Amino acid sequence: FVMSLVDLHKETGVSALDLAKGMLDYGLHPPTMYFPLIVHEALMVEPCETESKETMDEVCDIYCKLFELAHSDPEALHTAPHDTPVRRLDEVGAARNTILRYTFA
């Protein structure tokens, strides 16, 4: 399913990218962002058919926590992730200056 975070963005300034980065702090792989292009502030969530109800409930609980955090402390999501080895990457720079091969030293 696809969800639009336009209202959340208007209310709190938290974007789909911010929410996706916040998911990393909870150990979740973020969904596809900003696709389809006709949906503004889109997150496309595609759970596997084999996921248990318990896992889906846990993911829903994390989404609720993130939405609460967006309203109570939006800056925490603007600066997320906090608990990963690498913080926010320069995604524009990475897209424009791609490294397709890496040589280990």
Locations of regions flagged by a protein language model:
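Non-catalytic terminal extensions of PLP-dependent enzymes
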Residues: 2-105
